[in-house]
Curated annotation (Swiss-Prot):
This is Phosphoheptose isomerase. InterPro entries: GmhA/DiaA, Phosphoheptose_Isoase, SIS_dom, SIS_dom_sf, SIS_GmhA/DiaA_subfam. Its EC number is 5.3.1.28. The keyword Ubl conjugation does not apply. The gene is gmhA. It comes from the Bacteria. NCBIfam families: PRK13936.1. Zn(2+) binds at residues 60, 64, 174, 182. Disulfide bonds: none annotated. Its cofactor is Zn(2+).
């Protein structure tokens, strides 16, 4: 197969996964946006975590809220727990890599805050511990997962929201996670500041 054919095949796979996910995920994304808006209206904040590409997604989400998405508006409170290398390495060195997010949540999280927990497999141990810490702090969890939801899915409470991408391919899951994050940002803005359409 030549390279351009391979590229087309990858585009087609991404489009197909998004089409399959659209109707399945729309109600979950809507519910997650309502949870987030309610928290923001009640002086809560967003915390976000993940590993690797999911860490990048956590930072992307937080930056869109703190700065802006597609319109001028006030900054919204969001913290990516993936960015402070001194904190991450000190916790990993002194305790365990599994605690790099949970210790931050115990310090920063407050009742009514929301944790955006991201893992393509749903089995990242440090994200699982982050969910447990968020529940201990009476936070609500929005989980971006894939495959069968992994260990994260089994920890979620009725008030939590799982956005589970119907795919087993990591790259396709990540692509839909990014789209879901953009949908959340758009819905948060439109609910808080009105629709621009």
């Amino acid at each position: 197969m030549d390279m351009q054919s391979r590229i087309r095949r990858l585009f087609e796979a991404s489009i197909e996964t998004k089409q399959q996910a659209m109707d399945i995920l729309a109600p979950h994304i809507e519910q997650a946006s309502l949870v987030m808006v309610n928290a923001l209206l009640n002086e809560g904040k967003m915390l976000a975590c993940g590993n690797g590409g999911s860490a990048g997604d956590a930072q992307h989400f937080s930056s869109e809220l703190l700065n802006r998405f597609e319109r001028e508006r006030p900054s919204l409170p969001a913290i990516a727990l993936t960015t402070d290398s001194s904190t991450l390495t000190s916790i990993a060195n002194d305790y365990s890599y599994n605690e790099v997010f949970s210790k931050q949540i115990r310090a920063l999280g407050q009742p009514g805050d929301v944790l955006l927990a991201i893992s393509t497999s749903g089995n990242s141990a440090n994200v699982i511990q982050a969910i447990q810490a968020a529940h201990d702090r009476e936070m609500i969890v929005v989980a971006l997962t894939g495959r069968d939801g992994g260990g994260m899915a089994s920890l979620l409470l009725p008030e939590d929201v799982e956005i589970r991408v119907p795919s087993t391919v990591t790259a396709r899951i990540q692509e839909v996670h990014l789209l879901a994050i953009h949908c959340l940002c758009d819905l948060i803005d439109s609910q808080l500041f009105g629709s621009e359409e």
